[in-house]
Amino acid sequence: MTLSLHFDKGTIQLHGMAGKYMQHLDGISWDERTNSYRTPAANYRKLVTALCEKNISFQDHARKFSAETFVLKKNIRPRSFQSEAAEAWLSEKHGVVTLPTGAGKTILAVMLIAETGRPTLIHVPTIDLMRQWKEVLSEYFDTPIGLLGGGINDIQTITVATYDSALIHVTHQGNLFGLLVFDECHHLPGEQNQFTALGSIAPFRLGLTATPERADGKEQVLYELCGPLCYEVHIDELSGRTLAPYVVETIEVDMRPEEREQYEISRECYTDFLRKARISFQHPSGWAIFLRRTSESPEGRKAFKAYLLQKKLSQASGAKVDRLWELIQQHKGDRMLVFTQDNEMAYRIGNNFLLPVLTHHTKLPEREAFLKSFRSGEYPILVTSKVLNEGVDVPDANVGMIVSGSGSIREHVQRLGRILRARPGKQAILYELVSKDTGEYFTNQRRRKHRAYEGPVVLPDESGQNSAQIN
């Protein structure tokens, strides 16, 4: 009986004389429920390659896609680094490409989708990104572009899906696509998101991100699901050429006396508890231990409240709001994005200065109106918490102001990337407001070790010019 492969709910079932070949195949296990051998669908490429190399005859009933010819409606003239990235990825047709925001990741994907010639599913984290991808793909491809997400279920040979929607449908659609593209692929190792990759047989996989690093250290999971890092370019390497030249300026702000007094009292309460409980945040489980220990006693709960208060005082001091207003006055005529760590501070700034605020609570019609008005110049300033960290195209912004943020290097590189889309004569500047002599200051120092902060600043001159075979 000939060995046969079948797709079943995000896995590959092996029927026939599978047991005879088990010593030749890795990652295969016996499923007592169905009396068959089974492997995750993501192992399809490795499985088929092994069968071919061992000259084992098989029938492939798993794959429900075939080669496609995608006609481009307009020519692409790639930049040198895009050509290098394409060549690196095409050598194996799987892997992660790291390019800064604004460096043309979407255009690179268009090139590789056309070159690979397989039905393609593009994964994105948000509805906004899903729509932006469809606009670009429709501009280049002479084929309908499908959408999966936001209440839309339209599968085409090229389809854009949110990670959430792709996860829902992967168990029955995981054999329809030969190429998976993961935009903002640092999301992929998430507890749920990774199943969108595990449940698909697609042999060809492209990960795109500006910053593959994760706070939980799960980059290796990303590479296992998507392929190794095959090409990388950093922000500082493209500054003044593909990206606008930029400056990052950290401004240390003295807290108001009453805020400083509250901060010191709260921080002393919080750090005393850490010392008594012998908790170190240098330990990988330090934060989890802190949360557990603070829940076990009144003293612990008091320490946790003190921790939250000292953090809030440093991130959202009134002195920062005063300094922000000075910067806004200084940059009249510029397009500014103001970033905060939380919605409360974003709305506080918006209310104080009568500025539009974008958060995840903003309804879609209002959100689109704000972005349209920002692009037209009617609104020169937008305030946001985390919504604009990734995925929303705001090419006209040239000044970024980080009032508060997390310790994540990725978040800050993403925020820098929001203001770096090039245009003639553009000079970008990113301000980081940091409360002096607080924990926030030391967090900022750790972030600044990233090479985006260390790269040479490229300023424009007066003319505006810059100094196994699977088919």
Residue positions per predicted region:
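Conserved helicase ATPase core of P-loop NTP-dependent helicases/translocases
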Residues: 131, 144-155, 335-339, 344-350, ...
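Accessory DNA-engaging acidic/polar modules
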Residues: 1-84
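Conserved SF2 helicase motif VI
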Residues: 99, 211-212, 408-429
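Walker A/P-loop
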Residues: 91-116
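Conserved segment of the helicase C-terminal RecA-like domain
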Residues: 418-447
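A short beta-strand element within the Helicase C-terminal
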Residues: 175-180, 220, 383, 390-406, ...
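Conserved helicase/translocase motor-coupling segment
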Residues: 279-367
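Post-DEXD/H (motif II) to motif III coupling segment of the RecA-like Helicase ATP-binding lobe
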Residues: 186-247, 256-261, 265, 272
